Design a protein with these regions (language model features):
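Secreted, disulfide-rich extracellular signaling modules
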Residues: 1-312
Length: 312
């Protein structure tokens, strides 16, 4: 193929999609950065117009001077994302979307290998800033170890539309770039037969794994307070909603049935479905409810425990 020696004078088709990256006055490559949110399913209206804003968590928390991932309290649903990013300077991009992307043909969407996604392409300024660090560190063996300091994390906020929930299962950053071809051992630039610098297409992918924490911030409307204040009944709303406490009269049962032998005890809690609703889509009643002893509730979720029939 055609080799490009001058990063400032690339082909028009490349120039439209790639940003020139400079280290000082020297051009070191052309770069494009895309961030994907992959989801396997959704809840609600497939065609409701929604919008998300994506921010880099590049702000260190006041008092500790550390990024969010060093804060042990940052992994709970009451996390305050505002402590770790700036609304004006940390914006990576915004994207309008629907759960079912009609711009993708039916033949593609119906493939068993197709996974829907929402994509954000970083603008020129952000690409220059992040691309410079990645291109400079890209030739080192420990790039992935350094990545956390180069890009501490991202925060995605749903700021328009409330008719759809995406069940995101993976986040991926793809960095595609043109750079000088270099000797794999010496690191020296390779040249063409005409003596010009050789340029190659290359890329890096940074994909979330189990070790990459996905913390969810959930906020409830003011109407939830009406449910909390009711005295004739209680509600269950999870996660980050209403957590009802049930007190079991163990002492009273013991005093009354202390001399009896019980093989099994059944706990029954009657539930009532909402009779009417103005919502087009409603979640079905859960098939089971998790009961956890109060003193064990924090450890249960922190340690990813399963119900054992004793503590939960």
């Amino acid at each position: 193929g055609k080799m490009i020696a001058d990063f400032n004078n690339v082909e028009e088709s490349v120039h439209k999609n790639y940003t020139t990256i400079k280290d000082g006055e020297t051009s070191i490559g052309n770069c494009q950065i895309n961030i994907y949110l992959w989801y396997d399913s959704y809840f609600g209206d497939s065609l409701t117009a929604c919008r998300l804003s994506m921010y880099e968590l590049d702000k260190k928390k006041e008092g500790t001077n550390e990024y969010w991932y060093k804060d042990p309290n940052a992994y709970y649903t009451n996390i305050d994302p505002d402590l770790y990013y700036d609304k004006e300077t940390s914006l990576l991009g915004r994207k309008s979307y629907t759960a079912v992307d009609l711009s993708v043909s039916d033949s593609i969407r119906n493939l068993s290998t197709y996974t829907p996604y929402v994509k954000i392409t970083l603008d020129k300024a952000r690409t220059e800033e992040l691309g410079k660090e990645l291109l400079k560190e890209g030739r080192t063996k420990d790039l992935y170890k350094k990545f956390q300091d180069i890009f501490p994390g991202l925060y995605v906020e749903s700021d328009y539309g409330d008719g759809t929930i995406l069940y995101v299962n993976a986040v991926q950053m793809d960095v595609a770039f043109l750079e000088h071809a270099r000797d794999s051992i010496t690191g020296a630039k390779l040249r063409t037969s005409l003596g010009k610098d050789s340029v190659v297409y290359a890329g890096r992918s940074f994909t979330s794994t189990r070790e990459v924490i996905q913390a969810n911030k959930l906020e409830n409307g003011t109407k939830i307070e009406e449910c909390i204040d009711r005295k004739d009944c209680t509600y269950l709303k999870s996660p980050a909603g209403i957590f009802t406490e049930v007190t079991l009269p163990i002492e009273e049962i013991s005093n009354t049935l202390g001399s009896d032998t019980l093989n099994a005890v059944k706990l029954s809690i009657p539930i009532y479905n909402e009779a009417t609703s103005d919502k087009k889509f409603g979640m079905s009643v859960p098939r089971s409810v998790l009961l956890i002893r109060k003193k064990y509730k924090d450890d249960f979720f922190k340690n990813n425990e399963l119900s054992d029939g004793i503590k939960s």
